[in-house]
Amino acid sequence: MANVDELLETFGNMTLLELSDFVKKFEEKFEVTAAAPVAVAAAGGAAAPAEAAEEQDEFDVILEGAGDKKIQVIKVVREIVSGLGLKEAKDLVEGAPKPILEKVAKDAADAAKAKLEEAGAKVSVK
């Protein structure tokens, strides 16, 4: 365990350029890569872009317009977006098209879209 602590201390004293050089040499010596596993998965999916689109797991909910029932839409926006005050929600609705939620799960995006559409808003999920 002392060796690991010594290595950490040494790495802590190195500059970013020295660390970058170390990583390159480490990758060459042990024939590995320091790339994140997500990047590896994305590289495999690049061969079939249609499949990559189907496997999307993060969605943005975009408010395209408030429609006729702006007050109802503002109430729903405040309900969906936590910590949003009345003025912020009003500005968000009046400034449409704007993202309401970003990088959320499909279930959450669909639920938010349904609530907003029920209130009279025009919404898209991307």
UniProtKB/Swiss-Prot annotation:
Sorted UniProt keywords: Ribonucleoprotein, Ribosomal protein
Domain of life where this protein originates: Bacteria
Cellular component GO terms, alphabetical: cytosolic large ribosomal subunit
GO biological process, one term: translation
One annotated GO molecular function: mRNA binding
InterPro entries xref list: Ribosomal_bL12 (IPR000206), Ribosomal_bL12_C (IPR013823), Ribosomal_bL12_C/ClpS-like (IPR014719), Ribosomal_bL12_oligo (IPR008932), Ribosomal_bL12_oligo_N_sf (IPR036235)
Cited function: Forms part of the ribosomal stalk which helps the ribosome interact with GTP-bound translation factors. Is thus essential for accurate translation.
Known partners and oligomeric status: Homodimer. Part of the ribosomal stalk of the 50S ribosomal subunit. Forms a multimeric L10(L12)X complex, where L10 forms an elongated spine to which 2 to 4 L12 dimers bind in a sequential fashion. Binds GTP-bound translation factors.
PANTHER family (alphabetical): 39S RIBOSOMAL PROTEIN L12 (PTHR45987), LARGE RIBOSOMAL SUBUNIT PROTEIN BL12M (PTHR45987:SF4)
Family stated for the protein in its record: Belongs to the bacterial ribosomal protein bL12 family.
HAMAP family in the cross-refs: Ribosomal_bL12
Official protein name in the record: Large ribosomal subunit protein bL12
